[in-house]
A protein has these predicted regions:
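Beta-strand-loop-alpha-helix segment that lines the small-molecule cofactor/substrate pocket
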Residues: 98-100, 106-107, 111-158
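C-terminal helix-rich "cap/oligomerization" subdomain common to oxidoreductases
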Residues: 17, 26-32, 36, 77-79, ...
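Short acidic low-complexity segments
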Residues: 85-96
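Rossmann-like NAD(P)H-binding beta-loop-alpha module
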Residues: 160-179
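Rossmann-like dinucleotide-binding domain that binds NAD(P)(H)
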Residues: 176-269, 283-285, 367, 371, ...
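N-terminal Rossmann-like dinucleotide-binding module
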Residues: 28-82, 96
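N-terminal amphipathic/hydrophobic targeting modules at extreme N-termini
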Residues: 4, 8-11, 15-16, 21-22
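C-terminal glycine/acidic-rich active-site capping loop/insertion
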Residues: 231, 244, 258, 269, ...
Length: 398
């Protein structure tokens, strides 16, 4: 993407910088932050902290009532470090009657924990994937059919960059889309984007074949630290082909270093009958069938913080995306000092709260989330066995 405008501000850690209006909670007498949409977080790991940062960046919209931790030691640590209310009591969390509960636990436990909180009558916004095996996916689908409310936090379609690109392609500028290459997100995230760009229904059958490679790569950045000593290690790269029964095809390519490494570029190539989009360039035929090209232009607002995590010390927030003079994206709630990922998750949070209140449909359907997780399961099987695996989506309807 092309930066057309750079602004920077210096802020302290949000835990210290923001002042919130408070009131006493009727449920437990605790002093809580007053916001528009109330939520709780189940879990206190790396991903859970995304929701904490979002709540602190959007106090006029969200109220984080509590973070549930399994141990008092963990609860005390999180409360002290982030200046938020934590608890080891599930009953206290349920008593808040939040708009939704974020399920941010270990992947292997997401399904069961989501079910537990749905059984309490609370709408859940669960981290990805929906589940790791087909039986668990069937269980979640049964809960959905029984009227329970679950949203899986598949955020990549809500990324400003993807929303803008999907809007541009949806305008018909490159005609009907038939194939794509994607090297941007792994497994279920990648599948979600493939289906979005290709216009694939969640119940569309497909075949998948793939292979895992290992290549020496210089290590640069992890979730928590940065390496500058030039160390090299073998890193995995998965390459696969998804061929859908409707005739459309997606070539998937993901490197294990891709999310953070500055030497592994994300790339998306989408081809249609009348043109193609390659990252921030679009090539198409005009009404006279003459070739044209335009650039997708992205402006960023840069926020520098004092956070010691190298991933959080500098936040690039999308300020505007346009192409050929037409605005494709602007932040609906203004600039908040959030990354693309956090902006996308915040959008899902707002839409989930509205869904809970019956004011809007689910922001990401259970069928979509199940289709993503199911495709990821088959991808792993194809890579492991070396075989071309065929899907059978009938079970979703059983």
């Amino acid at each position: 993407m092309v930066i057309i405008k750079q602004m920077e501000i210096s802020v302290k850690n949000n835990a210290d910088a923001l002042i919130f209006h408070t009131a006493l909670c009727d449920a437990c007498g605790m002093e809580i932050i007053m916001g528009k949409y109330h939520f709780i977080i189940i879990g206190a790991g790396w991903r859970a902290l995304y929701y904490v940062r979002i709540a602190k960046a959007m106090p006029d919209i969200f109220c984080l009532d509590a973070v549930y931790c399994r141990t008092q030691e963990k609860a005390d640590k999180i409360a002290r470090e982030y200046q938020i209310h934590t608890t080891t009591s599930k009953e206290e969390c349920a008593a808040y009657k939040p708009d939704f509960a974020v399920i941010a636990v270990n992947k292997a436990k997401i399904c069961n924990v989501a079910v537990e909180w749905m059984d309490r009558g609370i709408t859940v916004l669960s981290e990805t994937p929906a589940a790791l095996d087909i039986e668990a996916l069937k269980k979640l689908y049964g809960y959905y059919k029984a009227g329970k409310k679950q949203v899986v936090a598949e955020q990549y379609r809500e990324y400003p960059s993807n929303k803008a690109a999907l809007r541009l392609i949806g305008s018909g500028i490159i005609g009907d889309v038939n194939c794509m290459n994607i090297s941007l997100a792994h497994e279920y995230h990648g599948v979600s984007l493939m289906r979005a760009y290709l216009g694939i229904r969640p119940d569309e059958n497909f075949t998948v074949s793939g292979k895992m490679y290992e290549f020496p790569t210089t290590e640069t950045l992890t979730r928590y630290e940065q390496f500058t000593d030039g160390r090299v290690a073998n890193k995995k790269r998965c390459v696969a082909a998804f061929e859908y029964d409707c005739g459309k095809t997606a070539w998937y390519d993901f490197d294990s270093e891709q999310y953070r490494s500055p030497i592994r570029k994300n790339t998306v190539k989408v081809q249609g009958i009348r043109g193609e989009m390659i990252d921030d360039r679009i090539y198409y035929l005009d009404k006279n069938n003459k070739g044209q090209a335009d650039q997708i232009i992205t402006g960023f607002h840069i926020t520098r913080t004092d956070n010691p995590n190298p991933n959080l010390s500098e936040i690039y927030e999308v300020e505007k995306i346009s192409c050929a003079g037409k605005v494709l994206y602007e932040p609906q709630w203004g600039l908040r000092g959030l990354s693309e990922d956090e902006t996308a998750v915040a959008t899902l949070m707002i839409k989930t709260a509205l869904y809970n209140r019956d004011e809007a449909p689910a922001p990401y359907s259970v069928e979509d989330a199940i289709a993503d997780a199911y495709a990821a399961i088959l991808l792993k099987e194809a890579v492991k066995t070396g075989k071309c695996i065929r899907s059978d989506m009938k079970w979703i309807k059983e």
